[in-house]
């Protein structure tokens, strides 16, 4: 269990509560603003996390494996993603200005600035169109956008006065992935592909939702969501 401390050290415990022997107890320069992630790339293990200004890439013992010299500017609760771009594995995240930052496992940094992407949004990274490369799914207030690695705008949707949540991705098949997002203000749930909102949506609901495949004679996809804090809603998804 990884435990970042107020002293900026990262401690590692066994489930018994004892310290893990051999752990180097690394220290960040500032408060850590991400979770601590384990990525495995080309047979090597990487432990990755960030503070407000730096990205740390360590080995399994807590020693620096890759040095990232470029200074960053990150907000609290920044998610980090492992992504494949042009056949190369990279770490992706967004900074306070809304730029997408890509860091490879040699410590090299590149930035992607998407049209209409500004600070304060929420980023997800998934292969939406099935081309083998991840796209960047970005929600902010009433706007949902999808960008490619060059920052080209592939999809834009805007719902007036909405307050959109994290943009989840649901995979129905190898060629059918869709984005699901909640409008917390309007208590609506949206599901859409790279062209338009799916048939029958938006639907009522005010929680993140799950989509599962039915069994025992109930073949098809079903959506489960909360409503009013006390009800569970079940919908059948028409493809």
Please tell me what each predicted stretch does.
Residues 1-239:
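Extracytoplasmic/lumenal domain signature
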């Amino acid at each position: 269990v990884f435990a970042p401390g107020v002293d900026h050290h990262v401690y590692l415990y066994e489930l018994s509560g004892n310290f893990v022997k051999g752990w180097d107890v690394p220290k960040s320069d500032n408060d850590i603003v991400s979770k601590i992630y384990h990525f495995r790339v080309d047979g090597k293990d990487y432990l990755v996390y960030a503070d407000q200004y730096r990205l740390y890439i360590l080995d399994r013992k807590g020693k620096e494996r890759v040095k990232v010299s470029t200074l960053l500017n990150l907000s609290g609760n920044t998610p980090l993603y492992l992504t494949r771009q042009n056949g190369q594995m990279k770490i992706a995240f967004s900074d306070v200005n809304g730029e997408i930052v890509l860091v490879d496992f040699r410590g090299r940094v590149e930035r992607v600035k998407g049209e209409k992407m500004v600070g304060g949004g929420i980023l997800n990274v998934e292969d939406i169109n099935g081309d083998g490369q991840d796209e960047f799914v970005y929600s902010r207030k009433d706007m949902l956008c999808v960008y490619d690695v060059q920052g080209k705008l592939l999809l834009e949707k805007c719902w007036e006065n909405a307050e959109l949540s994290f943009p989840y991705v649901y995979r129905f098949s190898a060629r059918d992935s869709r984005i699901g997002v909640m409008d917390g203000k309007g208590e609506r749930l949206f599901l859409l592909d790279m062209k338009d909102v799916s048939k029958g949506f938006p639907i009522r609901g005010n929680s993140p939702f799950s989509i599962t495949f039915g069994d025992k004679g109930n073949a098809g996809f079903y959506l489960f969501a909360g409503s009013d804090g006390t009800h569970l809603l079940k919908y059948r998804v028409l493809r």
